[in-house]
């Protein structure tokens, strides 16, 4: 599994901001976030599918008969989709998974209004390492968000914009479980 999850070179993983989460941690997070067998769950940067696997297990443990009906995901990387197909093959529901930058996706793209759970490990790319298109998309997320703060701006990392954008996907009383960097605790834009 490690080879599948790390299908990219170290250089490419850094470019994508991809850092994979240990399965024990993703399982603890899934078990905390998922409360009902009917919860709709979004993983906005599913990469090696670790969180999808943990969510599938959590759903089955609480009585969900077909967990793939509840799982949705986005990833910008075709290799993530290759991994998804290898792991889930015929169980995949195509409209549940979108090949795109999460910043450019909206709940309506999945055909539903919102999610009970958003879970994952967002990409860690500093603003100055983002492409022009990514920066423009992030600026639009910031401008359109009812949750924006005055501090999120030019110094923010992509994970900050992912979090801000994810808030428009979450159902009232839903849960967001994300692996965030320690800068979340002290970055000015994270306040």
Identify the function of each model-found stretch.
Residues 37-39, 68-69, 94, 112-115, ...:
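A general structural motif
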Residues 1-63, 69-87, 91-92, 106, ...:
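Class I S-adenosyl-L-methionine
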Residues 92-102:
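Conserved SAM-binding strand-loop segment of SAM-dependent methyltransferases
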Residues 7-12, 16-17, 49-53, 57-65, ...:
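SAM-dependent methyltransferase catalytic-core segment centered on the flexible catalytic loop
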Residues 71-73, 96, 118:
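Generic beta-strand hydrophobic packing signal
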């Amino acid at each position: 599994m490690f080879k599948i999850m790390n299908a990219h070179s170290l250089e490419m993983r850094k470019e994508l901001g991809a850092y994979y989460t240990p399965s024990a941690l993703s399982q603890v997070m899934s078990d905390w976030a998922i409360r009902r067998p009917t919860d709709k769950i979004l993983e906005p940067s599913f990469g090696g599918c670790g969180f999808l696997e943990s969510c599938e297990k959590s759903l089955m443990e609480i009585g969900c008969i077909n967990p793939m009906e509840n799982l949705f995901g986005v990833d910008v990387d075709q290799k993530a989709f290759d991994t998804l197909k290898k792991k889930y093959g015929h169980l995949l529901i195509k409209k549940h998974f979108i090949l795109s930058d999460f910043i450019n996706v909206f709940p309506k793209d999945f055909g539903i209004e919102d999610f009970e759970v958003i879970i994952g490990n967002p990409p860690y790319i500093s603003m100055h390492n983002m492409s022009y298109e990514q920066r423009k998309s992030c600026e639009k997320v910031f401008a359109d968000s009812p949750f924006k703060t005055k501090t999120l701006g030019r110094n923010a990392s992509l994970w900050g914009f992912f979090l801000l954008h994810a808030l428009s996907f979450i159902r009232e009383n839903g849960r967001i479980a994300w692996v965030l960097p320690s800068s979340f605790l002290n970055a000015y834009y994270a306040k």
